[in-house]
Amino acid sequence: MSTKTSIRGKSKKLTLSILISTVIYLLILLRLTLIEPNWILEIDLSEYSFIKTMGIIIVSVGFILGILALIAMKNSWRVGIKYNQKTALVTSGIYSISRNPYFLSYDILIFGYILIFPSIILMFLYLTLVYVFHKMILEEEKYLQSVHNKHYLKYKKKVNRYLTIKL
């Protein structure tokens, strides 16, 4: 008999972030297939095709960053905080330059989509999502510090929350 271990935590912030992300992707999908741009208060940047090109590049960077984050996490990956599960503290790979590369990848990815499909509604949802992600990160940091104590504090001093640039 196998027992499945859930990878999803439970919190209002997590549920809200999933809801906002879903709405963003549905609006993008609807924009691609069915609706007129004005419905989502789209901003006309047709004169600036380089912005869409930058958006495509940024989406690609966000996608690759997300894949690298998932690969580095291996079996430690969770959606939200699972207080009853202790996983390894991952500090190598992409986690050596960002403590939160998966959240960062989502921020980058959705920002790229907004450059491709500039919309006031999408921008508002994006900023809300970035705020919710930040709150989730702060909550996760407290949890990681309580579970990994000195190891996490050492990691926290060495690697920035979002991006560590070493020159």
Question: What are these regions, as identified by a protein language model?
Answer:
Residues 1-88, 109-167:
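Membrane-anchoring alpha-helices and their flanking helix-loop junctions
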Residues 82-103:
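Active-site-proximal inter-transmembrane loops
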